């Protein structure tokens, strides 16, 4: 399937592989076949970039991979929410204009820029709410939505954040196993 639209993938060549990030400890993750078979694509240079940004922000790489899996199925060009949510991390541009400006991001369809905005936002939510579980709820619902629809009703654990957290643990184990090989 990847070969039918080769031009679509040139976006991964828009960034120099020399971003000065700390790659120590990086292990290539092989996305599950169910995703690659349906158009998911997470090439090594994108993974290395994501890993470096995660290290820079102090956010778990396995968490971000699990979040990308849940949000977009590794489809860097996915558009959701009636055309509002874009890319790997399904960023809602209207909600992140200030963040995009601060990060010099102009194009959420660019996977590198998309992941940078997503990790920056996730990092902020983890810092604000103190747990990955609550940060994921706020990522999914928006902060006001999480407060009104979940937390006000005593809901802290639900399908979205539990799926991501269990996948995070599985991905962590897979990466540790691959690092040991």
Regions picked out by a protein language model, each given a short descriptive name:
Residues 5-17:
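Short acidic-hydrophobic catalytic motif
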Residues 1-2:
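Gram-positive cell-envelope targeting signals
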Residues 15-181:
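Catalytic glycan-binding domains that act on GlcNAc-containing polysaccharides
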